[in-house]
């Protein structure tokens, strides 16, 4: 039996994988975020495309949290999209504890995504602001 060639075998893997963190209120933006990250030349790990069923409470929340923590740990960087929810804040803190680069992005209109600084972040009600001391 001979091995057939396939185009996928000639394509070099991306050098970086990023975890995309965002509030569930931006669930509807998950595919635009995935496209944005792919367009940057890196590979996204998007929990809302991997674990969207957790919103239906079909799986224990702590099971999904463990899965998210594992994916954050395996990713090279963490990119945050939109307002900071309490779970997103926890993912950022984890990434910083693991000495990962964290980048922040906001949405303008329906589909425009742009990078912002930590000083420009918007927090959901009751979420403590992020303070990052050094890398």
Task: Please report, for each region that a protein language model flagged, where it lies by residue.
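Conserved catalytic or regulatory cores that recognize and/or transform ribose-phosphate-containing ligands
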Residues: 1-135
């Amino acid at each position: 039996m001979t091995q057939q060639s396939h185009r996928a075998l000639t394509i070099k893997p991306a050098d970086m994988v990023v975890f995309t963190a965002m509030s569930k209120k931006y669930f509807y933006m998950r595919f635009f975020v995935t496209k944005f990250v792919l367009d940057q030349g890196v590979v996204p790990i998007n929990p809302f495309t991997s674990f969207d069923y957790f919103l239906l409470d079909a799986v224990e929340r702590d099971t999904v949290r463990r899965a998210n923590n594992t994916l954050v740990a395996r990713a090279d960087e963490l990119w945050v999209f939109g307002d900071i929810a309490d779970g997103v804040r926890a993912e950022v803190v984890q990434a910083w504890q693991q000495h990962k680069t964290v980048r922040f992005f906001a949405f303008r209109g329906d589909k425009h995504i742009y990078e912002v600084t930590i000083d420009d972040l918007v927090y959901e009600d009751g979420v403590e602001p992020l303070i990052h001391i050094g890398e």
